[in-house]
């Protein structure tokens, strides 16, 4: 029986980074898929601590909030930097990822038709900090922090991949980010995950917009 269980909707959403992390680290997990119809029936929501998914189970530990889950996996699997300095930087990067993910989600779910063009125009300014961070770490040839992968790398990779679908070519002016995506996506277990039917057949967002 896999030690981990992900309870979530049939879309990548807030769980694809943790799925990539688990796959890359050779961990197995169980998926409990919650359809929109099931969620709308209203029976599951009151049982969730914050009234939302994902729900994550690690043995007898149940967690909510996707970034708390990523941090838990980072600590338990050694993906949180090599020292406190790197851990602080990993937190900073992940918070930056979540800032942009929040903007992306607002546009996708609330203002796609009228807001997409303005969002894409502003995107370079949001991507630049990550290019800068890469340039400051071993010339951009390693990870976003230090010389070993962290949970923030998986979250950033997921964010960049969905933006490449939204705006193909968005990384053309960011050579370090472009190489970073190619490099991480080529890691054997991530490559296998990204080409798996489970990943390929899931719509990026619950409303079908991407």
UniProtKB/Swiss-Prot annotation:
Reaction(s) the record says it catalyses: RX + glutathione = an S-substituted glutathione + a halide anion + H(+)
Membrane-spanning residues: none
Tissue: Selectively expressed in gall bladder, colon, heart, and skeletal muscle.
Occurrences of domain GST N-terminal (ranges): 2-81
Keywords for this protein: Transferase
GO CC terms: cytosol
Domain of life from the UniProt record: Eukaryota
Pfam families: GST_C_3, GST_N
Domain GST C-terminal: 83-204
Annotated GO biological process: glutathione metabolic process
EC number(s) from the headed UniProt entry: 2.5.1.18
Enzyme class: transferase
GO molecular function: glutathione transferase activity
PANTHER family for the chain: GLUTATHIONE S-TRANSFERASE, GLUTATHIONE S-TRANSFERASE P
Protein function: Conjugation of reduced glutathione to a wide number of exogenous and endogenous hydrophobic electrophiles. Cannot metabolize 1-chloro-2,4-dinitrobenzene.
Family: Belongs to the GST superfamily. Pi family.
Subunit (UniProt): Homodimer.
Protein's name according to its UniProt entry: Glutathione S-transferase P 2
Gene transcribed to yield this protein: Gstp2
């Amino acid at each position: 029986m896999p030690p981990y269980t992900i309870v979530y909707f049939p879309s990548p959403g807030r769980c694809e980074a943790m799925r990539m992390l688990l796959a890359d680290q050779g961990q197995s997990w169980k998926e409990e898929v919650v359809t929109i119809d099931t969620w709308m029936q209203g029976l599951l929501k009151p049982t969730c601590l914050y009234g939302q998914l994902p729900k994550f189970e690690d043995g007898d530990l149940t967690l909510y909030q996707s970034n708390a889950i990523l941090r838990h996996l980072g600590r338990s699997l050694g993906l949180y930097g090599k020292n406190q300095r790197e851990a602080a930087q990993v937190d900073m990067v992940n918070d930056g990822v979540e800032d942009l993910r929040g903007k992306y989600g607002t546009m996708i779910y609330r203002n796609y038709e009228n807001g997409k063009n303005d969002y894409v125009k502003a995107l370079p300014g949001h991507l630049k900090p990550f290019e800068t961070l890469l340039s400051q770490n071993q010339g951009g040839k390693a990870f976003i922090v230090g010389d070993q992968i962290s949970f923030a790398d998986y979250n950033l990779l997921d964010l960049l991949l969905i933006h490449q679908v939204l705006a193909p070519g968005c990384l053309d002016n960011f050579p370090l980010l472009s190489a970073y995506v190619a490099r991480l996506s080529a890691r054997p277990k991530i490559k296998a995950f990204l080409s798996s039917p489970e990943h390929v057949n899931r719509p990026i967002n619950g409303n079908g917009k991407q």
